[in-house]
UniProtKB/Swiss-Prot annotation:
Protein name per UniProt: Adenine phosphoribosyltransferase
Keywords, alphabetical: Cytoplasm, Glycosyltransferase, Purine salvage, Transferase
Subunit field text: Homodimer.
Provenance organism: Rhodopirellula baltica (strain DSM 10527 / NCIMB 13988 / SH1)
Transmembrane in keyword set: no
Recorded catalytic activity of this chain's protein: AMP + diphosphate = 5-phospho-alpha-D-ribose 1-diphosphate + adenine
Gene Ontology BP, a term: adenine salvage
Annotated Gene Ontology cellular component terms: cytoplasm
Keyword Zinc recorded: no
Enzyme class: transferase
């Protein structure tokens, strides 16, 4: 309750903030022809960060969320404060070799190979109401894998919340029938460049 009151006392001044002003476009990164959406200015701005968390949480405030789940690494940035805002627990979803206890695992295919996500078997109890959180929805592959992993836990998945949605990449369709909420939507002429970012060969896990 204290966390909810703290957020409530802060959110009113930021209701009309244009968060796009705090997302920086970086052309030709990480290679020529790619446009990168850099959220580090938003993260460094206290009011913008608070407003982002508030807007990501807004549709789920009355949904009685038990657990917020997020995949490494950038999902952790928003997952923990959203859990605090919703008076819920936080459960990390990680790559292999990062979690020390008994695990549920889900392997999935990527354009350049395969990957795997894992969660502790006691992280989510059957029937708990879970919200999945990430900074970005693009092609939807990682979030879809998170959904399949949470289904193995017999969780009740309430929906997914993102700061940014790259609409033209079609990720939302992969998350059907679950409710998808995003704060900022981008699309149009830069869709192919942003698709290139999401499909680049995976690097080492964080």
């Amino acid at each position: 309750m204290c966390d909810q009151l703290a957020f409530a006392s802060q959110r009113k001044p930021y209701q009309h903030m244009d968060l796009r002003h705090h997302v920086r476009d970086i052309p030709d990164y990480p290679k020529p022809g790619i446009l990168f959406r850099d959220i580090t200015p938003l993260l460094a701005h206290p009011e913008a960060l608070t407003a982002s968390v508030e807007e990501m949480a807004k549709p789920f405030l009355d949904q009685k969320i038990d657990v917020v789940a997020a995949a490494e690494a950038r999902g952790f940035i928003f997952g923990t404060p959203l859990a605090m805002r919703l008076n819920a627990g936080f459960v990390p979803i990680r790559k292999p070799g990062k979690l020390p206890f008994d695990l549920h695992s889900f392997a999935y295919e990527l354009e350049y190979g395969s990957d795997e996500l894992q969660i502790h078997v006691d992280g989510i109890k059957p029937g708990q109401r879970v919200l999945i959180v990430d900074d970005l929805l693009a092609t939807g592959g990682t979030v879809e894998a998170c959904l399949r992993l949470l289904e193995k836990c017999d969780a009740e998945i309430v929906g997914c919340s993102f700061l940014i949605h790259l609409v033209a990449l079609g990720g939302e369709a992969r998350l059907s029938p679950y409710h998808v909420h995003s704060v900022l939507e981008y699309g149009g002429d830069d869709a192919e460049d942003e698709l290139s970012i999401q499909n680049r060969p995976p690097g080492p896990s964080v």
